[in-house]
UniProtKB/Swiss-Prot annotation:
Cofactor annotation: heme b
Highest taxon of source: Eukaryota
Binding site for a ubiquinone: H199
Gene3D superfamilies the record matches: Cytochrome Bc1 Complex, Chain C
GO biological process, one term: mitochondrial electron transport, ubiquinol to cytochrome c
Primary gene name: MT-CYB
Name the record gives this protein: Cytochrome b
Organism encoding this protein: Cerastes cerastes
Cofactor stoichiometry and binding remark: Binds 2 heme b groups non-covalently.
Alphabetical list of PANTHER family matching this protein: CYTOCHROME B
Binding residue positions for heme b b562: H81, H180
Amino acid sequence: LINYKNMLHQHPLKLFNLLPVGSNISTWWNFGSMLLACLMIQTVTGFFLAIHYTANINLAFSSIIHITRDVPYGWIMQNTHAIGASMFFMCIYTHIARGLYYGSYLNKEVWLSGTTLLIVLMRTAFFGYVLPWGQMSFWAATVITNLLTAIPYLGNTLTTWLWGGFSINDPTLTRFFALHFILPFIIISLSSIHIILLHNEGSSNPLGTNSDID
């Protein structure tokens, strides 16, 4: 029998390739790995898109057209980034559903770190959604950020602060782009914490069988 705890204390990188779990888990446990693949794809494609993107209300839409038409393989990067975002959320909701079904929420540290990840991911997705700054994204930014005005006393002040003025304008797009660029690095950090916390104890045992048979 392998003593995983001793091995984990030998080198911190062992946390990423040694998970004390037997063959009694199902295919539903693949979605965590798929999420890491999505995160890697989004980070790489997002970096190349950011190189050519212009965070200006007069040039943002034109820069997207420039990326898809003029930049070599830019259309692949743009489409992969857009479709990858949808795949990201499909995987994460399946990942959450599996956790709810099999009672993974009982592992509180892992579950709370995952919940934090979801909140940061949703914020990142929203900031990214408005970046093309076409008619739809401009409207979405106005409608969704206006929800802050529902907060008693502080609503109007918070909305004005987020917009960078009395209406959505160039400062809004600039800060949305800055936030969309920096938040993925926070997601990567939180993902590392999530993985370390998970590998510290191992996965749950949905079938209730002996996990030492391997």
